């Protein structure tokens, strides 16, 4: 899916993009605000213009991926069965034109061609205990952090919200960086420390097997700290150097791989307020967990725009995986019916208990193998209702017959979702620029592997052409 590069926009261009985004999101708010599980209870299909209904009705999932989401299958030619209304075409074009591009600047063969579980660009010790998605992420972000650290003369990297320490471990033991790893969960920190020792032993064994590989400098494991970072206050532990710098004060680089909700905001605030922090490389996620207010908006510019508000539902939608869903549409698997089944279940719940709206239904396994009445009975039991309630099977079957409409409506919302993410990240860019800092957004992960793939890079000195180097793959 094409889009716009943040690097191609001036400061004024970024401000105008924020204006355009708030206007477009206000125009299509009814689609973004809708909950797909209320498709039948709220008659969502009839909220669409009649001309849109005619264009979308009857489209199969692969056609939706190709025509609506603009993601055709390999070698597929886009063919419309009818002339679409200009308003629908305008929606599609606008969604593509105003969203930040998610395609990385590098074009290299997949690191998972030989083995879908093992990155060919990480050695075996660094792949152990690490899922393929995470292998890709720690390698790409770690390499970017190493380059950014070299460019800005950092003495220490601080990995905030480090979890099991996979990124910290790769940066410290794979790239030779001095790393402090901060995580609030004691259990995760203890596991990270065990994995550190396991990796050190594996690297020592590898050196003994390959004596020609000489370790030129001593290895430093990450320094782990158990600490919750309060988004509203400065964390002194975060700023303490691991060792006394040779000359002057420490120079810190803050990073966070999918720092959840307000944790990403905390990184920005520490970067802004603390002279010791000279660089930032942050990949955010879980936008629905942002404090409101407090986590968004951050910039004065966005806060002053009419229609800047992004309620919970919109921020939640921004966390969906567009590329992954388009791939599911192309495969047209039976798993797509889950939304339709859940929406049908909602009608039964509302009839039984009108005040019970959108209750959480714990995952029902193998939904695609169940008849609708079996699914409804299991769903009723999960929300504390009698699974033997009398069911209107004819009505349920009528709902199931509208599965493609449910998928089409959800695809519309998914088409717009990147605009919400773009506005959130653009607000962060503008927040940093308003304070005189240099900030860019770079897509560094493959979006098929890692949907939240935009890293916010910020420095207190201009990087110039160095930004192009940050995006490139290491050989």
From Swiss-Prot:
Chief subcellular location: membrane
Transmembrane is among the record's keywords: yes
Signal peptide annotation: none
Pfam families named among the record's database cross-references: Methyltransf_32
Top-level taxon of origin: Eukaryota
Membrane-traversing stretches: 406-426
Alphabetized UniProt keyword annotations: Coiled coil, Membrane, Transmembrane, Transmembrane helix
Cellular compartments annotated: Membrane
Membrane topology: Single-pass membrane protein
GO molecular-function term, one example from the UniProt record: rRNA (adenine-N6,N6-)-dimethyltransferase activity
UniProt GO cellular component terms: membrane
Coiled-coil region(s): 186-210
Family the entry assigns: Belongs to the METTL25 family.
Record-given protein name: Methyltransferase-like protein 25B
Organism: Homo sapiens (Human)
Gene this chain is encoded by: METTL25B
């Amino acid at each position: 899916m094409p889009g716009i590069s943040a690097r191609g926009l001036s400061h004024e261009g970024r401000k105008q993009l924020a204006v355009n985004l708030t206007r477009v999101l206000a125009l299509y708010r009814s689609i973004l605000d809708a909950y797909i599980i209320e498709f039948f209870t709220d008659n969502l299909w009839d909220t669409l213009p009649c001309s849109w209904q005619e264009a979308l009705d009857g489209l199969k999932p692969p056609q939706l991926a190709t025509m609506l989401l603009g993601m055709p299958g390999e070698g597929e030619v886009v063919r419309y069965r009818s002339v679409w209304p200009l308003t629908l075409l305008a929606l599609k074009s606008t969604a593509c034109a105003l969203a930040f591009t998610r395609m990385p600047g590098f074009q290299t063969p997949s690191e998972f061609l030989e083995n879908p579980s093992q990155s060919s660009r990480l050695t075996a010790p660094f792949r152990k205990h690490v899922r393929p998605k995470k292998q890709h992420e720690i390698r790409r972000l770690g390499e970017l952090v190493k380059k950014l650290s070299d460019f800005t003369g950092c003495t220490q990297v601080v990995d905030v919200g480090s979890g099991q320490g996979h990124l910290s471990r790769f940066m410290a033991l794979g790239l030779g960086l001095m790393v402090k790893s901060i995580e609030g969960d004691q259990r995760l920190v203890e596991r990270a420390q065990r994995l550190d020792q396991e990796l050190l032993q594996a690297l020592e064994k590898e050196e003994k097997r390959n004596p020609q590989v000489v370790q030129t400098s001593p290895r430093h494991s990450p320094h782990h700290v158990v600490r919750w970072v309060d988004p509203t206050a400065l964390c002194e532990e975060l700023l303490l150097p691991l060792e006394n710098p040779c000359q002057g004060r420490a120079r810190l680089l803050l990073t966070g791989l999918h720092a959840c909700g307000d944790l990403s905001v905390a990184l920005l605030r520490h970067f802004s307020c603390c002279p010791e922090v000279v660089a930032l490389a942050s990949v955010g996620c879980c936008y629905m967990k942002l404090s409101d207010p407090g986590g968004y908006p951050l910039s004065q510019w966005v806060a002053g725009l009419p229609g800047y508000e992004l309620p919970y539902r919109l921020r939640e939608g921004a966390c969906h995986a567009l590329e992954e869903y388009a791939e599911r549409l192309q495969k047209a698997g039976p798993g797509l019916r889950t939304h339709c089944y859940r929406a049908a279940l909602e009608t039964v719940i509302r009839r039984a208990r009108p005040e019970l709206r959108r209750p959480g239904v714990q995952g029902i396994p193998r939904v695609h193998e169940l008849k609708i009445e079996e699914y409804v009975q299991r769903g009723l039991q999960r929300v504390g209702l009698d699974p033997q309630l009398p069911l209107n099977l004819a009505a349920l079957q009528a709902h199931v017959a509208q599965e493609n409409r449910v998928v089409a409506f959800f695809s519309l919302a998914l088409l717009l979702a990147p605009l919400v993410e773009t506005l959130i990240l653009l607000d962060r860019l503008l927040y940093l620029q308003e304070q005189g800092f240099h900030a860019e957004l770079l897509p560094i992960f493959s979006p098929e592997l890692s949907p939240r793939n935009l890293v916010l890079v910020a420095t207190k000195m201009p990087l110039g052409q160095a930004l192009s180097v940050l995006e490139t793959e290491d050989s």
